[in-house]
Amino acid sequence: MAERANLVFHNKVIDGTAIKRLISRLIDHFGMAYTSHILDQVKTLGFQQATATSISLGIDDLLTIPSKGWLVQDAEQQSWILEKHHHYGNVHAVEKLRQSIEIWYATSEYLRQEMNPNFRMTDPFNPVHMMSFSGARGNASQVHQLVGMRGLMSDPQGQMIDLPIQSNLREGLSLTEYIISCYGARKGVVDTAVRTSDAGYLTRRLVEVVQHIVVRRTDCGTIRGISVSPRNKNRMMSERIFIQTLIGRVLADDIYIGSRCVAFRNQDLGIGLVNRLITFGTQSISIRTPFTCRSTSWICRLCYGRSPTHGDLVELGEAVGIIAGQSIGEPGTQLTLRTFHTGGVFTGGTAEHVRAPYSGKIKFNEDLVHPTRTRHGHPAFLCYIDLSVIIESEDIIHSVTIPPKSFLLVQNDQYVESEQVIAEIREGTYTFHFKERVRKYIYSDSEGEMHWSTDVSHAPEFTYSNVHLLPKTSHLWILSGGSCGSSLIFFSIHKDQDQMNIPFLSVERKSISSLSVNNDQVSQKVLSSDFADQTKFGIPDYSEFKGNLGTSHYNFIYSAIFHENSDLLAKRRRNRFLIPFQSIQEQEKEFIPHSGISIEIPINGIFRRNSIFAFFDDPRYRRKSSGILKYGTPKADSIIQKADMIEYRGVQKFKTKYEMKVDRFFFIPEEVHILPESSAIMVQNYSIIGVDTRLALNIRSQVGGLIRVERKKKRIELKIFSGDIHFPDKTDKISRHSGILIPPGRGKKNSKESKKFQNWIYVQRITPTKKKFFVLVRPVATYEIADSINLATLFPQDLFREKDNIQLRVFNYILYGNSKPTQGISDTSIQLVRTCLVLNWDQDNKNSSLEEVRAFFVEVSTKGLIRDFIRIGLVKSHISYIRKRNNSRDSGLISADHMNPFYSISPKAGILQQSLRQNHGTIRMFLNRNKESQSLLILSSSNCFRMGPFNHLKYHNVINQSITKNPLITIKNSSGPLGTATQISNFYSFLPLLTYNKISLIKYLKLDNLKYIFQVINSYLIDENGKIFNLDPYSNVVLNPFKLNWYFLHQNYHHNYCEETSTIISLGQLFCENVCIAKKEPHLKSGQVLIVQRDSVVIRSAKPYLATPGAKVHGHYREILYEGDTLVTFIYEKSRSGDITQGLPKVEQVLEVRSIDSISLNLEKRIKGWNKCITRILGIPWGFLIGAELTIVQSRISLVNKIQKVYRSQGVQIHNRHIEIIVRQITSKVLVSEEGMSNVFLPGELIGLLRAERTGRALEESICYRAVLLGITRASLNTQSFISEASFQETARVLAKAALRGRIDWLKGLKENVVLGGVIPAGTGFNKGLVHCSRQHTNILLEKKTKNLSLFEGDMRDILFYHREFCDSAISKSAFSRI
């Protein structure tokens, strides 16, 4: 009884895990027999209690957790806020998806954790609780779905559905939730069956790889070991995993504490010894593993260690390979099935949070951090090195060190509350996530014009296409607007480069036909006073405009200030300036357009290398009608594939430019009508119509032919194909083909139709029904692409004397893809081919650091003529100059540093008439021969002259200009359908004034250098060239500068003058929704400011889309996008590390060594790098041996870690040695390379590493090889036994190959003996199956061998493998980067 009194009494509920530990300790203390007796008693007790309790399970026992209601409500609130942020353009689609998933996953997990305490408190004897939490039936996840919430589902592809199932199975699912639940098909009958078969097949493959691994010796005599340490450079290994790794292993070396040996070599490690070693604080323990065993076809007892069944060293003859395969494959059916995106809660502690220990003010060094965004789109600072963060409170100062590559979530001098998250620590680089690169396409929600608010660079692989890369986080804007049909508007003011064909326009005895308006011909004339009465010049005065437009169609974007019956429609194509080289002649009061070169300047005036500088639309390649383009090399009735195109292969919805090297292309005309969805169509599909047939209410056909009706998103397309219909015979070859071009003279000679084959024809097969078909023979227009445009015809020869600096190259583009339709609204022409000039400089000077040049518009006055020119600055310094004009009061200024000098002043009438007759020119900047002074070179097609260096220049602060009268019609203060006029009250009238320091003025404030008192201007309208136009006809002040800000001053600020200002609004400014101009005023909608008036602003509504660096933007600046067009592509990495979808694909992908993502690719790249570098450093044969061995060690450890990580995340414990046996087999081969041809092995042959070493030593010649990672399937088909391979898969092929090669099977494995009915060489048949030398003889051989070890075999291996650093993959990686 005294003995019993010393025992500790435990009154504790124990679950399945605790029982496992108890049984393990009982076996250690009492042995197997006594333990089984104890467990028998436990079993009997359990059955007795269960019978007495008589637990039954009813639906009433499923109790929903009370806190679920407010948890779900909180999650919905967060999701709603997130949706708002996305709408305002603060987060993009990927960040929204990540955060949404994280919110719901956190809610679901919290509910799961609440479940157990809730049951314990409310109903501890609840049958569901007792069954699931004792481990008898069901698990936490299943009960969570019954009483918590089902949570997030994944679809069959493993993608997360971001709409969670909020109900649980007790409450029942709604219809939507039921469909999502079926779609996910998790934990269902189908899914279980699929998982079971997957896991079974995985087990079969694993067993196939290692079935021949049997314990055949006691000691292989290896001197190597793998070093295990509880802490290393990257991380702390948890004590539990450290103990699990050590127990059951055998020491590879003696362990000393000081000078005392506490454990000796070849001693197996039990729990007592491991605890003692941990207590002593041993830094590193070298153990033997299957990796260090000296044979690949068997294993020794000491390298394997203890048998998991009885706790002693494994017996000879035990088939440990099959046990290993079963151990890894069997848990596959138990794994839970979820998939999550990167981020905190999904991957099991991806990000740890640092919280403030108490309230206080944060202080840190701002120079050591870099502003960035977190994966959820929140602003943060990224630390590059260890950062010390100080938290100051009233009585204490606390310092926290943030490690590198962590996010700091607070600002300097910010006050933080206690327990507030201040930083997020990223995990070390040692972990291996299963990531895959996913593309997320963002589509446009509305129709409009594309605009972006930052510099966007071309993707290098798509230099001349419309795929752009974003260098920094910015917004993409879709400015609202639409394609405007006929009879909607009366007239429009054209701005820069708004090209339009106006077929008919009558204005009181004056007519303008085929007017193509370019540059600022209209804008300068209409908006300057000098042309108020010069209607004879061809510009109508609006007051006497009484004309009507004929059947004109406009194909352009209209802006937000358009409303029905409005007086003014302005098209905004802001900030992209196109100046044409175009001569304008006055002949009988008509403008005659000439096709010329248009120079294209980016928004910020900066050219990068190889950017398109100008383009030329050749009128020969213009078509009035719609049609299809075909090109390639026509050959034997077919079109060969596309030639040398630069095309983005991802999404084909947008218009790409193709750089072509073809000499001809074909245009197949067709008539196209696009109608609204609700239109009444008066023709049937596949019917044949004549000319002038009525198609819809107000549309008639212009050509006859076969009609095709296609219904697309929100519109109907009518296509009319002209041509001949041919009903083919069976003998007709032509009917077999569809969509081909046939050259002249290829028709049937004796037929009546031979005369129609004089030109190229296009044959198209039409199938109205399944049985009937006929062939449509359509006419084709053939275009030959002439030689490239000659630069000498555009510029005089002597202009390019300074060719050392700037080069212009010519490229031809086909603007439409092969077989792509070209659509044009009627009466507008379609340009098929565009010739582009590409700008480059400093070609010969490879070291030139000038990656971009700046282009400016300048005005140059010579002999009274004033011209606008472009200047391209190749020198980084700037030139400023002043030009005097007739009016001595006025002065103009251009400076490169302070503002974007896009700037033009309307000259007097006589000067304008002269300048209109001249061509526009271009100014380029060059360095003179002496490389010291700069000069401007003016390129003009009429004349050229040089202006010398500009020195001693002055400039003023204020630019102003007086215009006597401005006959513009004012815009009404009403909001159109696409724009918003917002009233702005409570501020004083403002005076616009440009200085280099932004100063806001109120009415009575004057500055010293202001000579004239400005009148108060009511409203301004922005112009393309940055001119600000006053819409008040009685005001005589117009300001010129490009950037002009308005400061709205509130009433209570008028005493403080410039000290405090409210919102600044600039013309042309883009801003997101929810920006408030003044207190208690309505929020602005997102858009672009078009007009600023005294009490309101007119905004063109726009939709912002946030995009982060690296996103690919599809489309060009100002391109018209329709609803549903692809706008941007995000490429992001999705992590699926902690979870497994439908069976075991992740473990399987590691074991099959598939390149699933960047991680596996990194491993393969690292292997290749090691092989190259080691060989280069150490030479042959050392390099091959050491390179292969180091590679193999490195990859083995990382593979074991990756597989263990997946299983541990699911709570499945597998001993490392099982995984090591599998990994050893898939990493034991090397590939013979072609670098050094040997007489023994063929290049490309797979051989064992040990065999390669021994053969090389025996032949004394170098064999070139490199390490490879084989998958388990490939390893199964590359064994020493062809019978084993043939019984696995591809039986006929394997046996045929083996017969041809004359292979011999030595029947060493288990499987081949089973197939042939022999004795299995394992277990009791171990000694019968194989003949062995005596034990004593083996030892003698080993001793002799050890004595004769060369330096190469012994010392070198010791140096490389005995120490920890070469075995650890992470350290190997750093060593590789240093090499």
From Swiss-Prot:
Subcellular location: Plastid, Chloroplast
GO biological process, any: DNA-templated transcription
Annotated InterPro entries: DNA-dir_RpoC2_beta_pp, RNA_pol_beta''_euk, RNA_pol_Rpb1_3_sf, RNA_pol_Rpb1_4, RNA_pol_Rpb1_5, Rpb1_funnel_sf
Reactions the enzyme catalyzes: RNA(n) + a ribonucleoside 5'-triphosphate = RNA(n+1) + diphosphate
CDD domains xrefs: RNAP_beta'_C
Transferase in keyword set: yes
SUPFAM superfamilies referenced in this protein's UniProt entry, alphabetically: beta and beta-prime subunits of DNA dependent RNA-polymerase
Cofactor: Zn(2+)
Subunit record text: In plastids the minimal PEP RNA polymerase catalytic core is composed of four subunits: alpha, beta, beta', and beta''. When a (nuclear-encoded) sigma factor is associated with the core the holoenzyme is formed, which can initiate transcription.
Name this polypeptide is given: DNA-directed RNA polymerase subunit beta''
Organism this protein belongs to: Olimarabidopsis pumila (Dwarf rocket)
